[in-house]
Amino acid sequence: MLVKQKIIPKKDGIKIINGLKKIEKEIDKGKFKFKEKFEDIHLNIEKRLFEIIGQSAGHLHTARSRNDQVVTDFKFWIKNATLDINDVLNLLIKSILKKAEKNIDTVMPGFTHLKNAQPISFAHYLLAYVEMLIRDKKRFLNNLELIDECPLGSAALAGTSYNIDRKFTAKKLGFKKPTGNSIDSVCDRDFAIDFLSAAATCAMHMSRLAEDFIIFNSEAFSFINFSDKVLTGSSIMPQKKNPDPAELIRGKTAINYGKSVSYTHLRAHETREDRGWRGGGVK
């Protein structure tokens, strides 16, 4: 974009692109040496670029701030994570549907207050979770619409005096359009809060399913069996087969709740960009 807008010479733009590609390969191969004295990833890459292409690397920072770059990177991460989660949810839904199809005529009790209430099929029970997971997918994918705006060009918070083309940059990076307000652009982390909220709701559904399976697997119910591959035994009671995976899924739900709430609180300050949002152990 900087070359297109004649902000920097074409030869320097080519050098920067080639240099960044070389750095990318070094990072992918684990050969890039990060140095703490250079403060962060941005300065590490910039210093390495100077080593590779010389003074042309000075143009790298033109019309750009860490503020707009960080939120852009964050949006990329959320996008990729959302698509990965969507793929996993699709596989889980297909697996549940396959199991439901085989159990259309399998009768089981439906419960209220953990007491037998009405007869249902096991398929009907499983399909309840399909509905939950479909809603989870929608929550994650709806957030992609909110993410699909590119913050680059907002700079520190008030834009830049360079004659940049934000629409061109947004399109090149796969965004639908540039963001509308530079202050909001660098302060916005709503998309992360929405992502964590969707993750917490999805985790809650997984916890419910895990708890159901723990109960159904118990001797009192004996509705389902787990493969020995995922069960653990006891050091003193040889008859024990413990559903550890389901228990771990249930237990980790609290982590998702905590991250969602703590990150929301971190963002509840006046309209500005600072490093506070990176605290609190939220990763």
Predicted segments with their positions:
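A helix-coil-helix interface module used to build multimeric assemblies
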Residues: 1-159, 164-171, 177, 232-234, ...
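Charged catalytic carboxylate motif
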Residues: 88, 125, 132, 198-201, ...
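Acidic, glycine-rich loop-and-beta core segments that form the ion-binding/anion-interacting portion
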Residues: 179-260
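Hydrophobic alpha-helical segments, chiefly the membrane-spanning helices
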Residues: 275-283
